[in-house]
Amino acid sequence: FFSLIPSLIGGLVSAIK
């Protein structure tokens, strides 16, 4: 579960950038 959190955050940051 905790592995999914950084993945989602990374995806959002990548989408924003």
Curated annotation (Swiss-Prot):
Tissues expressing this chain: Expressed by the venom gland.
Residue ranges of coiled coil: none
Disulfide bridges in this chain: none
Top-rank lineage group of the source organism: Eukaryota
Modification Lysine amide occurs at: 17
Function, in words: Antimicrobial peptide with low to moderate activity against most of clinically relevant Gram-positive and Gram-negative microbial pathogens (E.coli (DSM 787); MIC=200 ug/mL, K.pneumoniae (ATCC BAA 1705); MIC>40 ug/mL,0 A.baumannii (DSM 30008); MIC=100 ug/mL, S.aureus (ATCC 43300); MIC=25 ug/mL, S.epidermidis (DSM 28319); MIC=100 ug/mL, E.faecalis (MF 06036); MIC=100 ug/mL, E.faecium (NCTC 12201); MIC=50 ug/mL, C.difficile (DSM 27147); MIC=50 ug/mL, C.difficile (ATCC BAA 1382); MIC=50 ug/mL, and P.aeruginosa (DSM 50071); MIC>400 ug/mL).
The protein, known as: Peptide TtAP-3
